[in-house]
Design a protein with these regions (language model features):
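Non-catalytic C-terminal accessory region of glycerolipid acyltransferases
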Residues: 2-17, 50-86, 90, 222-331
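Residues at the C-termini of beta-strands that transition into short coil/loop
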Residues: 156, 193, 214, 274, ...
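A generic structural signal for well-ordered alpha-helical segments
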Residues: 143-145, 205, 231, 263
Length: 331
């Protein structure tokens, strides 16, 4: 017979919460590789003016999961509350396969359109590239509309395409880019250089004017910031994920100052955007799966000023407060 494992009784009514260790965002923002400090403003943290709040879960666990192991094998350890059941996981994988099939098919057709119009774009609209961004919006909308619902709030806070700005948002998932492209704004993303090597997608990014960045390379970071400043001065907008990477646990990480130094130097507003739900649909590390659900995009009022540290702090506070309001965590 199998062995029934019963959890060891705790010495107190409720076990004390375990303090969370430093997140990947803290490590990247604070020390770079092996503790080496970065030398450019892109890697500098911005302070959080709000007092640190320790949040408790919405509910307390009243029982522990027990596992029955057949054939005398024992299964130990607590179950992960975010684990997807096998049947639901299979459905998510199938949805993921169809999502990439639709995305790839649409990308091939629309990439041809981008190539056709590119000479005219370089001639008449080299910096904003509105025609290319319009095609990208169609592509993202086609890819998304069949798989998850989008809800927008605060669209009136978006400046017109003719007004340059620095956009910033929290980063939860691979789906963030698709979602943001549906806004139809001509902002230039910053992406790892390796992504440009992906057929069709990488080539389309080049046509859109996406800015390449070699991570852990201080010279590349400095060149990236200089290019962003130049683009903004020429009337284009830029988009940053100030955390520098996707959140592994869904909590908002530390912001770096690079985006806000660009805004401070050029005098353009910062447009904070909060993304809700993308990390649940396609969590980091599970890019082959696509869960069902919806995504909400909240565009906040512009933040203006000439002090990069204050811009960073104010923009992060707006996004952090919104995430907390909707039940998300903040580091």
């Amino acid at each position: 017979m199998g062995t029934l494992l019963w959890p060891r009784p705790a010495t107190t009514a409720f076990a004390p919460p375990i303090a969370a260790g430093p997140s990947a965002a803290h490590v990247v923002a604070g020390g770079g590789v092996k503790g080496r400090p970065r030398r450019v403003s892109l890697a500098l943290r911005c302070p959080d003016p709000r007092p640190r709040v320790i949040q408790e879960g919405r509910g307390r666990r009243t029982a522990s999961r027990s596992y029955v192991a057949a054939g005398g094998a024992a299964a130990a350890g607590a179950g992960d509350s975010s684990r997807v059941l096998p049947d639901l996981q299979m459905v998510s994988r199938i949805r993921g396969v169809f999502f990439y099939m639709v995305t790839s098919a649409a990308a091939i057709v629309l990439f041809i359109a981008m190539v056709v119009v590119h000479p005219l774009v370089l001639l008449f609209d080299r910096y904003r590239r509105r025609a290319q961004h319009y095609i990208a919006k169609i592509w993202a909308t086609l890819a998304i509309s069949m798989f998850y619902k989008l809800e927008f709030e605060g669209m009136e806070n978006l400046p017109p395409n003719t007004s340059p700005a620095v956009y910033v948002a929290n980063h939860q998932s691979f789906l963030d880019i698709y979602t943001l492209l549906t806004l139809g704004r001509c902002f230039k993303f910053i992406s790892k250089t390796s992504i440009f090597m992906i057929p069709i997608i990488g080539w389309a990014m080049y046509l859109l004017g996406v800015i390449p960045l070699r991570r852990m390379d201080s010279r590349s970071q400095l060149d990236c910031l200089k290019r962003c400043v130049d683009l903004v001065k020429r009337g284009a907008s830029v988009f940053f994920f100030p955390e520098g990477t996707r959140s592994k646990d869904g909590k908002l990480g530390v912001f770096k100052r690079g985006a806000f130094s660009v805004a401070a130097k050029t005098g353009v507003p910062v447009i904070p955007i909060t993304l809700l739900g993308t990390g649940k649909l396609m969590p980091p590390g599970m890019e082959g799966n696509l869960n069902s659900g919806s995504v909400k995009v909240i565009i906040h009022r512009p933040v203006e000023g000439d002090n990069a540290e204050k811009l960073c702090s104010n923009a992060r506070s707006v996004i952090a407060d919104t995430l907390l309001l909707h039940g998300y965590g903040v580091h």
